[in-house]
From Swiss-Prot:
Function: Seems to promote the survival of visceral and proprioceptive sensory neurons.
Protein keywords: Cleavage on pair of basic residues, Disulfide bond, Glycoprotein, Growth factor, Secreted, Signal
Family according to the record: Belongs to the NGF-beta family.
Subcellular localization, as worded in the UniProt entry: Secreted
Signal peptide residues on this chain, from the entry's feature table: 1-18
Cysteine pairs bridged by disulfides in the record: 153-218, 196-247, 206-249
Glycosylation sites: 131
Transmembrane segments: none
Name used for this protein in its record: Neurotrophin-3
PANTHER family tied to this protein: NERVE GROWTH FACTOR NGF -RELATED, NEUROTROPHIN-3
Tissue-specific expression: Brain and peripheral tissues.
Alphabetical list of InterPro entries matching this protein: Cystine-knot_cytokine, Nerve_growth_factor-like, Nerve_growth_factor-rel, Nerve_growth_factor_CS, Neurotrophin-3, NTF3_N
Length: 258
């Protein structure tokens, strides 16, 4: 198409020059050589553009094809921080430093004292060691009696040694590992829980609440801690589970009271 355009354009240019010039005209040889050069230039341009396209296609064909990520098939376990039941090892125990909670303890013996952060709570110890009250707890009890302060609800704290199941942060029922085999002696998992002694410490509900305008009741509250658990007896790992951690007073306004 471009060659035809060049020929028509040159013929038109020659006609104009023939009309405007007297006896002189463009030599026939020079005109033919000009046409030949234009045709050669156009052919060379087309050839170069075709070569560039071929080089680009060859380069793309040599590149490795990117594979799409394979979706796990149904029932296939994806790689995660959880391990199969048969592969539970000391690596999970090393992770306790990262997932450590003061209310969760891995030990080869039953704990006799509350965690350091909860020494000032009303701890219910093991009956065997109930008489071994530490001087620190005795001093705190005496100091508390002189302050004239009372709790709205009465709570008690203790180490739970037989926890077998719990609800995780997704709302799923999971199995709590009671014993973990490591090396020479297995270790057990203990949970320091706090709950209400009774729903109504006084006749009408919580202590110190105006019962003319309010209904009150002591309720155990839960929070999340990290614990070694398994789901469907397959994958073992550290999960967030709910345990009893406090006793609070729940209030509701009495109907007809303002």
């Amino acid at each position: 198409m471009s060659i035809l355009f060049y020929v028509i354009f040159l013929a038109y240019l020659r006609g104009i020059q023939g009309n405007s010039m007297d006896q002189r005209s463009l030599p026939e040889d020079s005109l033919n050589s000009l046409i030949i050069k234009l045709i050669q230039a156009d052919i060379l341009k087309n050839k170069l553009s075709k070569q560039m396209v071929d080089v680009k296609e060859n380069y793309q064909s040599t590149l490795p094809k990117a594979e799409a990520p394979r979706e796990p098939e149904q029932g296939e376990a994806t790689r995660s921080e959880f391990q199969p039941m048969i592969a539970t090892d000391t690596e999970l125990l090393r992770q306790q430093r990262r997932y450590n909670s003061p209310r969760v303890l891995l030990s080869d013996s039953t704990p006799l004292e509350p965690p350091p952060l909860y020494l000032m709570e009303d701890y219910v110890g093991n009956p065997v060691v109930a008489n071994r009250t530490s001087p620190r707890r005795k001093r705190y009890a005496e100091h508390k009696s002189h302050r004239g302060e009372y709790s709205v609800c009465d709570s008690e704290s203790l180490w739970v040694t037989d926890k077998s199941s719990a609800i995780d942060i997704r709302g799923h029922q999971v199995t709590v590992l009671g014993e973990i085999k490591t090396g020479n002696s297995p270790v057990k998992q203990y949970f320091y829980e706090t709950r209400c002694k009774e729903a109504r410490p006084v006749k009408n509900g919580c202590r110190g609440i105006d019962d003319k305008h309010w209904n009150s009741q002591c309720k155990t509250s839960q929070t999340y801690v990290r614990a070694l658990t398994s789901e469907n007896n397959k994958l073992v790992g550290w999960r967030w589970i709910r345990i009893d951690t406090s006793c609070v007073c729940a209030l509701s306004r009495k109907i007809g009271r303002t």
